[in-house]
Amino acid sequence: MSRLTTLRLTVAATLITIFAGGAIIASQKSAANMAKAAAGFLDSLTPEQKANVAFPFESDERLRWHFIPNETFPRKGLMIKDMNETQRRLAHDLLRSGLSARGYLKVTSIMELEDILKVIETGGKFARNKEEYLFSIFGTPAASGRWGWRVEGHHVSVRFAVADGAVTDNVASSPMFLGTNPAEVREGDRKGLRVLADEEDAARALVMALPAELQKQAVVSAIAPADILTMNKNDIKPLPDQGVLYAALPAQQQALLSRVIEVYTSNMEADIAAERLAKIRAAGMDKIRFAWLGETDKGKKHYYSVQGPTFLIEYDNTQNNGNHVHSVWRDFNGDFGRDVLREHLKKDAH
C-alpha cells in the first residue's frame, strides 16, 4: 500500500473521530433547516395537494416503506410530476435540508436512472418515470414537538424524524435505502456512470486488502443472497454474528472499514452524520463486524454487511447478473425515530 493511500486512510479515520466528537451539539441546525424547508413546501400546496402530503406523526403510514416500483407498492404522498415549478424547487430544498451535497447528488441521480431504464426495458411492465417520487410530511414542521418527512419511490427511501426531548436524538434518519439499476451504465450517453460506486469500491478495497487468514474470516460464503436480508421490515434484529471483527484488523484495514462506514454516513448533512458516528463510537468500534458473501471480482454477484451494536449496513449486488445494487442503513433502536424508552413505557401503561 502506498504512503499516499495510507495517509488518506489515516485522515479518513481521524475525520470520523473529529466528527463524532462534535456530535454533542446534535442535529439542531439540520432540524431547523428541515422545519423551514418543510413549512415552505407545505405553504406552496393547494388544499387538495396538502391532503395527499400531510399525515399525523402517529400515522401508520409513516412506518410503511419499500424500495420497489410504485406499481407493486402503492405509496401515499405527492409525486414530483404533480407539482408546479415552484413546488418542485421547494421539494428539492426539503430534500437538500437533510442530505449532504454528495447524498443529494446520489438521490437525484438514482431518479434520473429511471430514464435509462425506460430505454433498456422497452415494453417492460413498469412505467419508468424520474418524476414518480413522492413527498410526505408527518406532523407539523416546527422547532419543537415531533414531526418528520419522507421521500420515496423506486430505489429511493429517505426519511427523517425530528424530536425535541431529552431521550431521543434531535434527528433520526433511518431506514435509508438507495439502489441503482443499472449499477453501471454500459451503453449510451451515460456509459460508465456508477451512482453508488463508492459503496461498492470501498468494501471491495477492504476485502481485497485483508491478509489471507482474515479474508477467510470475512468471506463467509461463495454465494451472495438474492437481496438485502432485512428487506423492508419495520423492526429488525441484528444479523447472526459473522465475518471479521474491527478489533482483529490491522490499522490500515481498520481505516478501510471506517471508510466503508463513512461512505454511508456522508450522505447525510454533516451534523446528522456526526451524530450517527458518535453513536457508533460510543457503542464500540471494536465490536463492528464486516462480512462478504459472493465473489470478490468486480462485475460478479456479491453482498456485504457492516454491523455494530447499534446499526446495520447491507449492500447487495446480485440482480441483473450483478449489475443492480440495493443498499440500506438501519438503526436497531432508532429506525423511524422510535424512542425505545418511551415506547416501552407506553406499552407498560396498557
Where are these regions (language model features)?
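Helix-centric, low-specificity signal for extended rod-like, repetitive segments
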Residues: M1, G21-G22
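Bacterial N-terminal signal peptides that target proteins for export
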Residues: S2-A12
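Bacterial N-terminal signal peptides
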Residues: T10-G21
